[in-house]
């Protein structure tokens, strides 16, 4: 008699939950590819818009296709007045990820995906609208300013920085943001992406799938590591102080965010890319203290625990050097990862079976209901 082999692993670690053509993570311990392209190659030689097109279509665009795609995205940047009115009602103290979740859901009420033939339109609409959703709420709730949600910036990264700061970004800042969006765009079956695929497997609409993914990313065990890293780094006065205080954190068994990874075993290939940009921005700003402290943290964690930095750690100093408020770090992740989420929704729909796993019951043995007086 054959016995069914049961896979083990908390949180489904090490278990395959499906097939994808979109991304490989952790092959040989540290690899990352989007549709066959290495992440370092994409970060060096492409733009975020090209990567979004790649994930949605399976191939990089030629010049004509890219120009058409960017023009389509450009035309979708503004927000409906009804959505602006809702964003103005959201208090300053609200978690920014709740703002992104509400903005996504409400936009789906105003501009629904009526059938799956509109999936690319819905995905591109969210891609274009997310920077404005984030910045319109932030500028109004924190500064009382109703911003223009459009800009003449050519890239989505530049557009975001323009909305946030009220002026055109430098060429270097625009490129750094572009690279950051590329690095965060897709990462296989992480928790939020799998949430989107589960939702898609029920044949739900794009806005519902993305709203669910945002809610999942809101959890501190998935999103927010770059924010937590920034909060920690800001408490250190020097590299030596960082190492001393981190030793105390380890002794107290406190969790230190921004290190290690669930899939990568040797290194996170995104780290070396964003770390180099952090160093460039430090030199540009004429203040390398934040970068030097970050390097000290990296050295300490490797020497002490053999834990490497993941993509989030040096993103903290990178965003800080560009003047981005810490509370917006994870919403930026949403602006980027939307491409991966939407691509996975589209892929799930192409060969769909509802995702419905089983569970191993570990509860009480069968029993009878006793009269209430005898319980």
Task: Walk through the language-model features, giving the residues of each.
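Non-transmembrane, aqueous-exposed alpha-helical and coiled segments at domain scale
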Residues: 1-375
């Amino acid at each position: 008699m054959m016995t069914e082999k049961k896979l083990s692993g908390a949180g489904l670690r090490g278990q395959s939950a499906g097939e994808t053509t979109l991304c490989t993570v952790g092959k040989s311990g540290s690899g990352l590819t989007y549709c066959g392209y290495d992440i370092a190659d994409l970060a060096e030689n492409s733009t975020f818009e090209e990567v979004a097109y790649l994930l949605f279509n399976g191939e990089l665009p030629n010049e004509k296709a890219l120009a058409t795609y960017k023009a389509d995205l450009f035309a979708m940047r503004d927000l409906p007045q009804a959505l602006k009115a809702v964003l103005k009602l959201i208090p300053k103290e609200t978690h920014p990820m709740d703002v992104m979740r509400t903005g996504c859901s409400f936009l789906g009420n105003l501009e629904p995906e009526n059938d799956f033939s509109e999936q690319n339109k819905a995905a591109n609409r969210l891609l274009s609208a997310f920077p404005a959703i984030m910045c319109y709420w932030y500028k109004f709730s924190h500064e009382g300013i109703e911003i223009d949600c459009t800009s003449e910036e050519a890239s989505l990264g530049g557009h975001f920085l323009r909305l946030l700061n009220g002026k055109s970004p430098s060429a270097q800042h625009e490129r750094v943001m572009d690279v950051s969006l590329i690095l965060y765009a897709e990462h296989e079956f992480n928790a939020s992406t799998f949430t989107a695929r589960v939702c898609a497997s029920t044949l739900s609409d794009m806005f519902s799938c993305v709203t669910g993914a945002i809610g999942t990313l809101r959890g501190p065990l998935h999103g927010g590591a770059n924010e937590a890293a920034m909060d920690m780094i800001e408490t250190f006065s020097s590299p030596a102080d960082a190492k001393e205080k981190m030793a105390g954190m380890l002794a107290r068994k406190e969790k230190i965010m921004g290190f290690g990874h669930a899939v990568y075993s040797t290194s996170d290939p995104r780290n070396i890319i964003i770390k180099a940009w952090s160093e460039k921005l430090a030199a540009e700003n004429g203040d390398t203290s934040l970068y030097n402290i970050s390097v000290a943290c990296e050295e300490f964690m490797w020497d002490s625990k053999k834990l490497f930095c993941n993509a989030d750690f040096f993103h903290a100093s990178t965003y800080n050097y560009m003047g981005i408020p810490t509370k917006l770090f994870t919403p930026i992740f949403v602006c980027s990862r939307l491409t991966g989420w939407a691509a996975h929704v589209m892929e799930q729909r192409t060969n769909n079976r509802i995702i419905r796993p089983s569970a191993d019951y570990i509860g009480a043995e069968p029993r009878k209901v006793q009269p209430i007086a005898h319980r």
